[in-house]
């Protein structure tokens, strides 16, 4: 609920959400339903309905440019994180999810890899630095500009 409130109060242009995901090499985790992610192999970039494609691609380009290792994970209808709240409130905030792979989630012996923690921080830092002032990731801005261009090329009957 906090993420939805934030969108109303500060009206962000972009939301890069961080959370954790399962290290699926952990015993009793089903790779068929959870995907394949492991600690020590980098942050996990999510593909999901709430994740804005243009922003996600910027994050991937940033990781590749800065040689930050990363993994990919597909989510179904919901990510189960604040990404959903940002994406579907206040007219839709361009949102992305970068997760930290975690072994033994919700136990007293949770484990992460130090390199993954550092790479999550680097990836967010470099991505934020790549953003331009008032840059829009909105699908609507792109389609609106294309529609305007089409109209200018072919304004219809005179």
PLM features per residue range, with description:
Residues 1-42, 83, 135, 139:
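Acidic/histidine-rich catalytic neighborhood of metal-dependent amide-processing enzymes
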